[in-house]
Amino acid sequence: MTSELPPQIQNQIAQLQQVQQQVQALAMQKSQIEAMQKESKMALEELEKLADDAVVYRNVGELVIKTSKEESVSKLKDREETLSLRLQSISRQEERLTTRFKQLQEQIQQALGPKAQ
């Protein structure tokens, strides 16, 4: 059937598939970032339960480093903020791609006309 379609419609279908793949990739990234946010939030909640002078250890690559509660809280809050910004950015990209997907879908349906139904 694809060989019967005009090149312009074939191109639009290819673009539609590409946009669909990008939306799926963004959804996966969004899910990963949300999981990282949840981890950070849980770690912060646990740190808040500790005494201010508690000894805390954190992973840095393959090392475990001794640090203060204050420094750990600060790093986790920075991480949460960064993740939140990335999540907002991904959501905006997702919205744009979803809009583009709908536009391409409509263009293809209009180009195919009553044959598609």
Swiss-Prot record:
Q: What is its main location?
A: cytoplasm
Q: Quaternary form? A: Heterohexamer of two alpha and four beta subunits.
* Protein name according to UniProt: Prefoldin subunit beta
Q: Name one GO cellular component term.
A: prefoldin complex
What PANTHER family does the annotation carry? PREFOLDIN SUBUNIT 1, PREFOLDIN SUBUNIT 1-RELATED
Subcellular locations according to the entry? Cytoplasm
Q: Which Pfam families match?
A: Prefoldin_2
Provenance organism: Methanosarcina acetivorans (strain ATCC 35395 / DSM 2834 / JCM 12185 / C2A)
Protein family according to the UniProt entry: Belongs to the prefoldin subunit beta family.
Q: What does this protein do?
A: Molecular chaperone capable of stabilizing a range of proteins. Seems to fulfill an ATP-independent, HSP70-like function in archaeal de novo protein folding.
Alphabetized, the UniProt keywords read: Chaperone, Cytoplasm
Q: Which HAMAP family match?
A: PfdB
Molecular function as annotated in GO = protein folding chaperone; unfolded protein binding
